[in-house]
Regions:
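SAM cofactor-binding core of SAM-dependent methyltransferases
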Residues: 2-58
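Extreme N-terminus of proteins, especially the signal/transit-peptide cleavage junction
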Residues: 1, 23, 99-103
Length: 213
């Protein structure tokens, strides 16, 4: 199980995934700019590369190349990456879903920065320079993971009357993903506070998984 971990923090997603998949779990790459977090990641996953900037799509994709993903000459995937990096078109115009299912990445996780949506802040949403959902989806388009898992604050649901959240889901669906959404409080896992969080789970329609999810 190959895992690409964006906005990794101190590795919570990767730690949880290792509990689930055990020895079958392998982190391919972290994306994290905080220096303290990088030290923690290097301590616990010393051989896993860290990319600091989520805008560096090409560098992130190189770590999927090392898994042999492009050995079969997936020209559609190459075009996807070129469009994302060079063209920067509007989301709906950037790419069409791949026609193949050779992505080496099983899971892409992302704790996308929550400050633009948090009710503790100004909820500037897409006007905030920390709004990094477009960059996250650029990586999704280029890598085409089988599964995506995103986490954010509940305030994401109410930005611009809910239109921003609907747009995020529509963009995932437009590039070939089936999407499920949940709001789960931390107290559901016995934490001593509520702390509601939005979870978005997306599965590539290109992977049938023998009818199983």
């Amino acid at each position: 199980m190959k895992h690409l971990d964006l906005f990794s923090g101190v590795g919570g997603f990767s730690l949880a995934a290792s509990w689930v998949w055990g020895k079958d779990h392998e982190v391919v790459c972290f994306c994290e700019q905080d220096k303290f977090c990088q030290k923690v990641l290097n301590k616990h996953w010393p051989n896993v590369p860290i990319v600091e900037d989520v805008n560096d799509v090409e560098r992130i994709v190189t770590y999927t190349k090392r898994l042999g993903r492009w050995e079969r000459g997936n020209t559609q995937t190459e075009r996807n990456t070129e469009e994302v990096v060079m063209a920067r078109q509007e989301p709906a115009e950037r790419t069409r879903p791949d026609t193949g299912t050779d992505s080496a990445i099983t899971l892409l996780s992302a704790g996308v920065p929550c400050q633009p949506a948090s009710v503790a802040g100004k909820q500037s949403g897409t006007r905030d320079d920390r709004w990094l959902w477009p960059q996250t989806f650029d990586v999704v388009r280029a890598v085409r993971p089988r599964w995506c898992l995103f986490e954010n604050v509940r305030g994401l649901l109410s930005l611009e009357g809910g239109m921003v959240f609907k747009s995020l889901l529509s963009e995932l669906e437009a590039i070939g993903y089936e999407v499920w959404c949940f709001v789960l409080p931390a107290c559901a896992k016995n934490a001593p506070h509520r702390r509601d969080r939005v979870w978005i789970v997306a599965h590539s329609k290109l992977w049938e998984d023998n009818g199983k999810r």
